[in-house]
């Protein structure tokens, strides 16, 4: 903050597990997020990276609802939409957990946007299971999607399961990416005509609170937050202006 930074990002392999090491305290990710915002009143923006949707952190949801310095963008570590595949991945959540998480977050903050990771072609995945991932992306309205084709690693539990043919993995990964592009484009269109707060990073390019990448028509110094009218979609995301 002393160096004029305007946004802090909390990141980690499993952010949602923070606090569980304090066996004698009932700490959670929401607790530390709230504490940071209370301690640093001049911090304009706090962003949280990847979150496990297995359980709803109601303390985090309270902060999301009442302190808009917590950015309305959450990246969920989803991986798949089929419950059996999720169990074989040893994930802690099921399809319905993702939907419940998204609904609760939306209820608290209706402008929130979600990202998610998805794996195509995990061992034993059939077409029906693959379609559950496609369905989940649409139902949960995931906007920012990272797609990873499954890659076999020796001496892992998954390597001993029936493998999906490489050409099928590639086909399903493409279908997921095509849907991801459709979802993202739909979101970009919805932003046109709105006014967004943009944190400028360099070359008059920055990110809005919902993580849209925005190029400004005017030159704006880095580390500046400006109100920006969104004009149109451009090759990198969105084009905006600081002029009324």
Each model region followed by its residue ranges:
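Short, charged low-complexity intrinsically disordered segments located at boundaries
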Residues: 63-67, 92-93, 133-134, 202-211
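Generic alpha-helical hydrophobic packing signal
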Residues: 42-43, 67-70, 134, 138, ...
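Active-site proximal loops enriched in glycine and acidic residues that flank catalytic Cys/His/Asp
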Residues: 12, 50, 78-80, 116-120, ...
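A structural motif corresponding to the C-terminal lobe/cap of the Radical SAM core domain
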Residues: 72, 84-199
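Conserved SAM/AdoMet-binding glycine-rich loop
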Residues: 2-126, 138
């Amino acid at each position: 903050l002393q160096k004029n930074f305007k946004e802090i990002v909390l990141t980690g392999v499993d952010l949602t597990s923070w606090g569980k090491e304090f066996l004698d305290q009932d700490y959670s990710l929401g607790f530390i997020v709230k504490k940071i915002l209370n301690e640093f009143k001049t911090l304009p923006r706090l962003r949280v990276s990847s979150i496990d949707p297995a359980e709803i952190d109601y303390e985090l949801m309270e902060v999301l609802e009442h302190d808009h310095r917590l950015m309305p963008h959450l990246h969920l570590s989803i991986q798949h939409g089929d419950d059996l595949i999720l169990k074989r991945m040893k994930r802690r959540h099921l399809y319905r957990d993702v939907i419940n998480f998204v609904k609760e977050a939306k209820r608290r903050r209706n402008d929130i946007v979600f990202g998610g990771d998805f794996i195509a072609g995990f061992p034993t995945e059939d077409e029906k299971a693959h379609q559950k991932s496609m369905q989940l992306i649409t139902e949960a309205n995931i906007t920012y999607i990272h797609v990873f084709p499954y890659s076999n690693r020796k001496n892992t539990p998954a390597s001993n399961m029936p493998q999906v043919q490489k050409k099928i993995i590639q086909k399903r990964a493409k279908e997921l990416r095509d849907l991801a592009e459709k979802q993202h484009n739909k979101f970009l269109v919805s932003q046109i005509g709105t006014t967004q707060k943009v944190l400028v990073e360099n070359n008059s390019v920055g990110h809005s609170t919902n993580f849209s990448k925005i190029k400004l028509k005017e030159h704006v110094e880095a580390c500046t937050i400006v109100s920006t009218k969104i004009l149109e979609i451009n090759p990198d995301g969105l084009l905006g202006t600081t002029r009324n």
